[in-house]
């Protein structure tokens, strides 16, 4: 994983005119090889796979009651 390291002290510059204002400093990434994610070398999906989602299993015992109650009454403000 990348570590964020500040530049050297010579790169620090004060921020603002007053002495009570803190300092602003820049930082850089030490290792930027995996910065954009590891999936850059993966092949793009085939045309038939675009937009297809994986099957979702809902494991909630109350889902039938919730769906039934949603169809019985209209949402407020309609």
From Swiss-Prot:
Any one GO molecular function term: protein kinase binding
This protein's UniProt keywords = Cell projection, Protein kinase inhibitor, Synapse
Q: Where in the cell is it found?
A: Synapse; Cell projection, Dendrite; Postsynaptic density
Q: Which BP terms from GO are recorded?
A: long-term memory; positive regulation of inflammatory response
According to the record, the signal peptide region is: none
Q: Where is this region: CAMK2 inhibitory domain?
A: 41-68
InterPro entries recorded: Camk2n
What cellular component terms from Gene Ontology apply here? dendrite; postsynaptic density; synapse
Record text on subunit structure and interactions: Interacts with CAMK2B; the presence of Ca(2+)/calmodulin increases the interaction but is not essential. Interacts with CAMK2A; this interaction requires CAMK2A activation by Ca(2+).
Q: What does this protein do?
A: Potent and specific inhibitor of CaM-kinase II (CAMK2). Plays a role in the maintenance of long-term retrieval-induced memory in response to contextual fear. Modulates blood pressure and vascular reactivity via regulation of CAMK2 activity in addition to regulation of left ventricular mass. Mediates the NLRP3 inflammasome in cardiomyocytes via acting as an inhibitor of the MAPK14/p38 and MAPK8/JNK pathways, thereby regulating ventricular remodeling and cardiac rhythm post-myocardial infarction.
**Similarity field:** Belongs to the CAMK2N family.
**Descriptive protein name:** Calcium/calmodulin-dependent protein kinase II inhibitor 1
Q: State the organism of origin.
A: Homo sapiens
Gene for this protein? Answer: CAMK2N1
């Amino acid at each position: 994983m990348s570590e964020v390291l500040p530049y050297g002290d010579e790169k620090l510059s004060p921020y603002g005119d007053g002495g009570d204002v803190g300092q602003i400093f820049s930082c850089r990434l030490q290792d930027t090889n995996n910065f954009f994610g590891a999936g850059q070398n993966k092949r793009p999906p085939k045309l038939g796979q675009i937009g297809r989602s994986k099957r979702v299993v809902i494991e909630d015992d109350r889902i039938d009651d919730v769906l039934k109650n949603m169809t019985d009454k209209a949402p407020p403000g309609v």
